[in-house]
Amino acid sequence: MKYALDTNIFIDAFRDRAAEAALLAFLERALPVTFMSAVVMQELAAGARTTQAARDVQQGVFEPFERRGRVFAPSTAAFAESGRVIATVAAREGWQLLTENPSLLNDALIAVSCREQDITLITRDGDFKRLSPLVRGFHYAAPWPPMAGPA
């Protein structure tokens, strides 16, 4: 199984030592099968408001995945499909796209691109429960999923 970490997992680790320890423990055993979404990179970079924070995110978060060639980006088809998913949610729930839930735009893109790569997203974000019925084949899990043992 392959994994990607959602933005909220990193934010929790930045803010709380116990969450950081849990993330590091997971990565210690799962780094070879863990990937970074380019969409998550964009969200984390946008949240790094100081030069030092930007450097820390680049060196401590992005570079380990980049060095291993473990960054994936949504395809053109993923952008189109995620747009259709958002339109469906907006119509069902009767909300205005950019004012009601702007983070859902990226969440839909993350869901579709994870599905494209056959990657399970680790997240605490409840929006993925709403999105998963609309993105067939997308899988997500709460932190921290059990790892398969040796065969």
Can you describe what each PLM-predicted range is?
Residues D6-T7, L44, S82, C114:
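Generic structural signal for small/hydrophobic residues in well-ordered secondary structure
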Residues M1-S37, G47-P64, M147-P150:
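Short, well-structured N-terminal submotif of metal-dependent ribonuclease cores
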